[in-house]
Amino acid sequence: MKTKFIFITGGVLSSLGKGLAAASIGALLKARGMTATIQKLDPYINVDPGTMNPFQHGEVYVTDDGAETDLDLGHYERYLDVSLSQKNNMTSGRVYHNVITKERRGDYLGGTVQVIPHITDEIKNAVMNVPNGEDVALIEIGGTVGDIEGLPFLEAIRQLRSELGSENVLYIHLTLVPYLAAAGEVKTKPTQHSVKELRSIGIHPDIILCRSEVDLDEDIKRKIALFCDVDRDAVFTAVDVKSIYQLPLSFYNEGLDQKIAIMLKLPAKNCNLESWRKLNHTLENPTGETTIGIVGKYVDLKEAYKSLHEALIHGGVANEVKVNLRYVNSEEITPENVKEKLAGCDGVLVPGGFGNRGVEGKITAIQYARENKVPFFGICLGMQCAVIEYARNVMGLKGANSEEFNPEGDDNVIYLMKEWYDYRTKKTENRCEESDKGGTMRLGAYPCKVVEGTKAMAAYGKTEIQERHRHRYEFNKEKFADQLVEAGLVLSGLSPDEALVEIVEVADHPWFLGCQFHPEFKSNPMHAHPLFRDFIKASCENKNK
């Protein structure tokens, strides 16, 4: 069967949930026995989000091949249970970079390079490069209809319908239908104007997905269908839900997957959603609960820790407990108030990050967790801070620090990696202080050897694993490993050549583990990551002791 394309646009305002809608539709199609792939087109000019402020963009999601991508790719991977790559996220910056590179190379034979056809052709090439024999390709266009940056992308997908045939392309438009509590009614005018804007570009949506606080009644759906020139049965409610994992079931109950199958002439198959029903039953009927303190500096924007948040929820599902998340600003933690700040936390997690702001608060929180036998999980910078804390307070190296925060220090147990072996390219990578910031870290999936008899081994159940990385600083193994091991630190995960330390533990602690990689990027609701599963288990045991 020829690949069918579903393009998902958004109107009225941003952050409506296009990514979750696309992921949920993909999950429904897979539940019907289809194969599916998915892509995010981002109109911003950045080549990728790797150097963007988390407060502006949210989390940077890393794929196996080392691509720094939009956080929506995390939703895609979790819902579709697939591994994506660089080709699944394309930005305006990358599009223009590719076109300019071709122009400099002479590929356009001296022609005038223009938005149409050169930019739009590059976008179309990116879209057509996504499917690899899958039945369906879902393409989400970031931003909002009407944004000037998004116009080339909308023009490109308009052209694709003519080129691929209307029977192979479906347009879904997600829009807002606000509910006015004071009047007790919903308003359709924003949706009408959004569709009008989209149609003025030449795109006539086939399905309208209406985000709303309340279920839309038949009269409202009929009105939207009339004014937006779509079939009545092509208007669906995307009602707010308590858990994002209810969305596939909500869309199924609306009949969205059935309508898509009819419009694209997909094979009629039953939709097996048993795993999603079981997941939601566990979320709604926990046997207990636990509270995790997340100590970071981006706590005012939860999107900065999106995959982390979800991975902790997955760990709760695996243990059939509700996970309450308490975000604690590391800049506000001091030795005097740390007990108060972390009171009631059954486990403490310090996530990744960059820069020295709030680092001492993280180290203080780690010391509290270690000394009071509170389960601790450190990720990336969190592991580095754990090593610094252990070196200072157990090994007695009071000046222990990171080269990132104290470049001239003599006791930097964490240092800038200037050389490492890339197992994918079979080449040695080299970096220095003057290297560009963008795309120069140790990125993507790397192998790791897990040491037997450790908590890491108990979690994974195997000695060889692959995990995703995003860092440029590393444990200074050559200079400090022997001293730290003698002081009781366990190096429980190493790179295959044993040059890099990937996991550390404290042996005389119920559960104290730090990892240099980002395990949250390989967790999904049906299969919690082993480390998150065991961290939540240890936190529950701490609560119940």
UniProtKB/Swiss-Prot annotation:
Binding site for UTP: 14, 187-192, 223
Positions annotated to bind ATP: 15-20, 72
Xref: Gene3D superfamilies: 3.40.50.880, P-loop containing nucleotide triphosphate hydrolases
This protein's GO CC annotations: cytosol
Source domain of life: Bacteria
Catalytic site positions: 380 (nucleophile), 518, 520
SUPFAM superfamilies on file: Class I glutamine amidotransferase-like, P-loop containing nucleoside triphosphate hydrolases
EC number: 6.3.4.2
Family: Belongs to the CTP synthase family.
Protein name: CTP synthase
Species of the source: Maridesulfovibrio salexigens (strain ATCC 14822 / DSM 2638 / NCIMB 8403 / VKM B-1763)
Encoding gene per record: pyrG
